[in-house]
UniProtKB/Swiss-Prot annotation:
Alphabetic keyword roster: Antibiotic biosynthesis
Superkingdom field: Bacteria
Family, per entry: Belongs to the cytochrome P450 family.
Gene3D superfamilies xref list: Cytochrome P450 (1.10.630.10)
Protein name: Anthracycline biosynthesis protein DnrQ
SUPFAM superfamilies: Cytochrome P450 (SSF48264)
Paired cysteines (S-S): none
BP-aspect Gene Ontology terms: antibiotic biosynthetic process
Amino acid sequence: MPTPTSAPPAAPTDSELGRHLLTVRGFHFVFGALGDPYARRLRGEADHLSLGELVRDRGPLHGSALGTWVTADGGISARLLDDPLLGPRHPASEGPQEHVLENVWETWRTCHVTPLGEDLLTPAAADSDRLAALLGPVLGPRTCTAWQVDAGRAVHRVLDGLPPHFDVVSDLARPAIAGSLAAVLGLPDEARAELPDLLAACGPVLDSALCPPRLPVARAMTQALRRVRELMAAAVANHLTAPADGAVSALLAVDPGGGRDPGDTVTAAVLSTVVGAETAITTVANAVMALLKHDEQWSLLRADPGRAADAVEETLRWAPPVTLRSLITQGEVQIGGETLEADQHVVVLVDAAQRDPALYEDPDRFRLDRPRSPGFTHMALAGRDHLGLVAPLVRVQCTAVLRALAERLPGLRAEGEPLRRGRSPVVRAPLSLRLAQK
């Protein structure tokens, strides 16, 4: 049933939000216990790849007990992510996509689980197109490489301060991505100082769309998101009055005098900070873990640090930073032998789809020399939504980190096993892994 058009809802109370989060989490556990593989994924079971195979074994597209259409088929997944009849929003709903005050026992909506108070993860198609037009000349697929030097300098400053033993996330990935983001955008010192802690607090944003965080985590996350927007609005205001180096001034110079709203530049900066940074941090950590587990691939990169981009691309396939993509049908869609009506929830299991033997040769192998067609993009960052918008900068940042590691820390080794963040079925976010440099 389509979502009715209505005014933006008032912020839910702690009681309302807590009840909603617990109810949806209960759905995951009940239907997971009954054997539904998608519900088991959302519960956070460790063997995520085996669960993806179970989903694929059920057919190209099947209905989960949670009321969601689910696929792990590589071909079907690629078509869904490229189909304009699927998007991040309910087709008849304006404003933030929230279901907190609904009776989910009746509506059966387990999408848009955690309200963010804004449309950061659910932009309308027109808004996405407008942001893409803004970002294209500055941080687009063909232009973002212009910021490689700025990103690289920031990464090397982080490496300069690393102790002999350090953590892949808190000491390497998060500071490197925060530093490179601040350098590329041209953020003031105040924002640079707050950025690492804000990135950590905003980390669960992508997961929270499908997996309920604990109530204190949800509140801290939305508070951090508001602070990020405040800092980016202040940075844009500064660049408006005193243009300077950095992507913020470059974005403000796009279509000068054309009536473009500076608020779009603020939103672009927020997207890069919240969505882009978490995606990049996860990609860096996943890449380091994959390389250190595959000595021959780490040796290839050490011998030729110029292959860092290849390492990033293979990580995006083999251990993607976004493993579940949530979509809503905007009209009737016929695919995979099924007819989906408008306003149906569809989830693509990206990690399983990108290991579909029908799509990739030797899909479980991590290899830097895997052939790719020109213009190819992995499913984790495909599409016109928030993930597609930040993809070029994510690639530049991650490439800068891996190249610097290969050049400066060739003796890098892992100490122990990695830990991943709880309630993170979408990102499967690395939490910690001790590393040592010889």
